Amino acid sequence: PYYLNYFEPQLSLPQNVDRLMFANDGKLKDEYDRLFASVFSSPEDMKAIVECIGRRHSGYMRKEISSFTGIEDSGNLSDKLKALVASNFIIEYAPFGDSVRNTRYKLVDPFCRFYQTYIKGRHNLPEDFWTQNMDSQAVISWRGIAFEEVCLNHISQIKKGLGIAGVSTEQSSWIQRGDNNNEGTQIDLIIKRKD
């Protein structure tokens, strides 16, 4: 809700995104760095973890995170992952049918996903980048991932809508890799009842 105060009601959503994120003086252009610096005592490590996890839609296991970030697989990494989960930047889950040993960490913060996909490392983008690319295949694919993340961030509301708010559940995804004989299949959200 705080960021909505920056929106100009006479502009379209894409125009507002351009004005806030892609304009040279955009109010949210540097928000990613400010956000991590204001929330965490070691913002660079936390950004490294989030950026690592954000590289793959299904996320990574902790040993992979340690390997990619150079942060030792120890209590220090555990504390950082717990802080990111508690802050709702990432979730921890075991893919459907896998053991807890295969626990993964997945990026679910929409702002971080947007920043990593469209801002980080990209310089000299036109100030109307979002307006010009709204119908591109890349943005359409990103919207699908963003919708999945909205669902993951609102499990309690989904459960309420399904009439199972009081039932203990686990959330996960399921992927069947394709091979020479079968196509691959993916289910983005499975809500498994524990009753």
Predicted regions located by residue number:
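Short amphipathic alpha-helical interaction segments
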Residues: 70-87
